[in-house]
Amino acid sequence: MAGAPGGGELGPAAGEPLLQRPDSGQGSPEPPAHGKPQQGFLSSLFTRDQSCPLMLQKTLDTNPYVKLLLDAMKHSGCAVNRGRHFSCEVCDGNVSGGFDASTSQIVLCENNIRNQAHMGRVVTHELIHAFDHCRAHVHWFTNIRHLACSEIRAASLSGDCSLVNELFRLRFGLKQHHQIETSCVSRPAMNSQSCLGLVSA
């Protein structure tokens, strides 16, 4: 989501990086877990409040895609600060993350992010939107092509639509993976546009 709905977009404060999220909290949806989630010994030692920030820090420190995106954003004049631009929160539904334009923060849904690999995909997905906004000054509410392009890039480049993830979502078809992947990367674009009321789903 970019700017305030119904009003003009406000620029960032002096020296504050441009970070906006196009899809009004619908980013990085994951299928709901079936039954009660199994907790391992180590994960049972941490409460949700502790595990989300720890997984985020590990992702920022070790995930090569995240490190590449953070470096690219820094070189584009949009440096990201962990304390300022990331927030672990409890979210409704099965949304895993999104961007809150009113606070310029990537919101990580601590109740829906299941493990370290999932955290890496969500952070990567959201940073792709932030990078698109930084480098291209995307108009999220006025140009649905910008929104769709960013969603397709994020779904494709973040690993959301990998063969393994699609198999876990019970979308089978080894020979037809390219067709399944095409459907996967277009799904978030359609969801974001329908949430904004720009197209009917």
From Swiss-Prot:
<keyword id="KW-0479">Metal-binding</keyword>
<dbReference type="GO" id="GO:0046872">
    <property type="term" value="F:metal ion binding"/>
</dbReference>
<feature type="compositionally biased region" description="Gly residues">
    <location>
        <begin position="1"/>
        <end position="10"/>
    </location>
</feature>
<feature type="active site">
    <location>
        <position position="126"/>
    </location>
</feature>
<dbReference type="InterPro" id="IPR019165">
    <property type="entry name" value="Peptidase_M76_ATP23"/>
</dbReference>
<protein>
    <recommendedName>
        <fullName>Mitochondrial inner membrane protease ATP23 homolog</fullName>
        <ecNumber>3.4.24.-</ecNumber>
    </recommendedName>
</protein>
<feature type="region of interest" description="Disordered">
    <location>
        <begin position="1"/>
        <end position="40"/>
    </location>
</feature>
<keyword id="KW-0645">Protease</keyword>
<dbReference type="GO" id="GO:0006508">
    <property type="term" value="P:proteolysis"/>
</dbReference>
<dbReference type="GO" id="GO:0004222">
    <property type="term" value="F:metalloendopeptidase activity"/>
</dbReference>
<feature type="binding site">
    <location>
        <position position="125"/>
    </location>
    <ligand>
        <name>a divalent metal cation</name>
    </ligand>
</feature>
<comment type="similarity">
    <text>Belongs to the peptidase M76 family.</text>
</comment>
<feature type="binding site">
    <location>
        <position position="129"/>
    </location>
    <ligand>
        <name>a divalent metal cation</name>
    </ligand>
</feature>
<keyword id="KW-0482">Metalloprotease</keyword>
<dbReference type="Pfam" id="PF09768">
    <property type="entry name" value="Peptidase_M76"/>
</dbReference>
<keyword id="KW-0378">Hydrolase</keyword>
<comment type="subunit">
    <text>Interacts with XRCC6.</text>
</comment>
